[in-house]
Structure formats: C-alpha cells, structure tokens
Amino acid sequence: DQLPESEAEIYACLAKDKYQIESSSIFMDKTSTNTSENIKNAIQIFNDHTIKHETMILIQDPILQKRSYVTALDMFNDRQKIINYAPIIPKLNSDGTIENDTPYLWEGTRLYELALGEVYRLRDDENGYGPKGKGFLRHVDIPEEVNRSFEIIADKMPEYLARCQ
C-alpha cells in the first residue's frame, strides 16, 4: 500500500480502518494549503453535497487549535455553532520534555517550531496575523505569561522562528 499524501487522506484512512466509516461517507479537501482555505473548502463540500452544517466540531492539533477556532469564527455565521475540541492536550515538563502518558504527534524541534509559530501568528502586531499585522485574524488576547515565554525562547533559540518569518 502507498502512504497517503495529504492530511485529509491520513484522516480518511484512520476513519475507515479504525472506526469502520464507509468511504462514501468521507468527503475530503486535499487542496487547501492553510487553515482559512481548509475551512472555506469544507463549507463548499458541505454545500456541494447538501450537508447541513449548523454545528461544526473543530478538532485540530492542540497547538493549532486556537488559531483554527478564531479563523472559523469569522467564516461561519451567527446561526452556526462551532464546538472547539482539542482531543489531546500535551503536558510539558519543566525540562522541556512531554509527559510520557501524553500521546503526541510532534517531538523536539518541530514541537517548538509549531508552538512559537502559533504565538507569532496569533499576535496582533506588525508580524502577526491580527488586524495590526496581516489582517487574517481578529484580535486575540494572549496572556502576558505566554508573551514573556515567547520572547525568552525566541531570543535564545531564534532558529525555531525561522519557519514562520
């Protein structure tokens, strides 16, 4: 068997193999390259197949969850409900490792890149995705402790920010 190429295909394989969901019940967006496109394309798939979508359960990598939710809020109308659910919340130890009992997809460098990249994007400044920056997101309040941690890590390990700049 060939490995799936897109994230959508990976989830489809999981749905079929682990949960016995029929292929005919799975609709995939294999073309999006960002969160906004993914949500827009999902809405189009719902409309194309006349699938009611008054309620959406948003399940995402927990590091990407907040930005995905904020993006979805601006793409759905007030009559639609978004249930924001992170199935896994990784617990970070003081030494930077993830607790063993927390199954998680990312390790080491990639985890730090994702975490720093999300704070970078959520910020409402000239570099972020908020109204004062690129304008992709509404303003998001980031706790001061998170901002301080971001600054410390970004200052000591600037290579982790390289992917988002």
Kindly label every feature range from the protein language model.
Residues 1-110, 160-165:
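A structural signal for short, hydrophobic/glycine-enriched beta-strand patches
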Residues 92-156:
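A conserved mid-domain beta-alpha-beta active-site/ligand-binding segment of alpha/beta enzyme cores
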